């Protein structure tokens, strides 16, 4: 088993006071066993590797809370389009051409990019979690998978299988309940997901209030915003999370606070698709995570 010493580092632990101090970090196998100042007694052990971090800042890895990792192959493929046209006219047709094994390879490309940016784990949603799981385990990268149940791919049975399988496998991977979005998922499937959430007593995650069009069409279908509709069917009874959260009113924000629905903002994506900007001051004022 490896035993690594990182020394002569400026260390930022991300505690509330944000103190930076000179010290070292020991990694015993896959666990951080020591963070602190130089301790001669601890350094008597034989390390398998010692790394001089002089001139560098050592801090916890970043977490990317919303990714579609295998979509690396679509970067710059379609620009200057609104979300629906971008998805339906360009992205979905290209994804339909993916062959067996492609997602594993493309996920590895994404993981390499994450690591060069200091990202050590991600929360990923895509069409084949098993291929990405294989890639993450092979590369020693931590991934939490989010289900993407919708009218076109996946099923409630598959969601149940992924929940049972990926949460009992390698410790680097795990799975959370999720649907792609309200606008891609029938009421029947959404209600089925709410039942799963109640069965497992688990939160549910999805793309939420990303565009003005999404909110307007949901109001036409159900007479409510996406947040209000999903809450009405019990989807958020055990909490959850919404990716984007751009087009939310005060009622939506109050529901998210009360039901412990976190909002993951995606400013670069929203800028690319001109979807809008999440109202961070309002979210913070409402007490939303």
For the regions a language model picked out, list residue spans one by one:
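Metal-coordinating catalytic core of metallo-dependent amide/deamination hydrolases
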Residues: 131-246
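Divalent metal-coordination and catalytic microenvironments
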Residues: 9, 25, 30, 55, ...
């Amino acid at each position: 088993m490896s035993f690594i010493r990182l020394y002569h580092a400026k260390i930022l632990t991300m505690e509330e006071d944000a103190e930076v101090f000179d010290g070292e970090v020991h990694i015993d196998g896959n666990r951080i066993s020591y963070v602190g100042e130089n301790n001669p007694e601890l350094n008597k052990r034989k390390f398998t590797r010692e790394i001089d971090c002089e001139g560098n800042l050592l801090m916890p890895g970043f977490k990317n809370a919303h990714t579609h990792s295998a979509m690396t192959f679509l970067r710059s493929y379609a620009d200057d389009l609104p979300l629906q046209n971008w998805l339906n006219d360009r992205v979905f047709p290209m994804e339909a051409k993916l062959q067996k094994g492609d997602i594993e390879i493309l996920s590895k490309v994404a993981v390499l990019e994450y690591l060069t940016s200091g990202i050590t784990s991600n929360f990923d949603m895509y069409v084949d979690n098993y291929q990405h799981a294989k890639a993450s385990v092979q590369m020693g990268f931590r991934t939490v998978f989010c289900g993407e149940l919708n009218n076109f791919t996946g099923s409630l049975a598959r969601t149940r299988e992924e929940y049972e399988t990926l949460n009992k496998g390698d410790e680097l991977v795990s799975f959370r309940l999720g649907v792609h979005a309200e606008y891609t998922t029938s009421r029947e499937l959404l209600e089925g997901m709410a039942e799963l959430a109640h069965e497992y007593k688990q939160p549910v995650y999805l793309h939420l209030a990303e565009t003005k069009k999404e909110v307007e069409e949901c109001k036409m279908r159900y007479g409510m915003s996406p947040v209000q509709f999903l809450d009405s069917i019990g989807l958020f009874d055990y909490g959850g999370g919404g990716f984007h959260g751009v087009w939310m009113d005060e009622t939506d924000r109050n529901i998210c606070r009360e039901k412990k629905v976190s909002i993951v903002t995606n400013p670069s994506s929203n800028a690319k698709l001109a979807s809008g900007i999440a109202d961070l001051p309002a979210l913070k004022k409402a007490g939303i995570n």
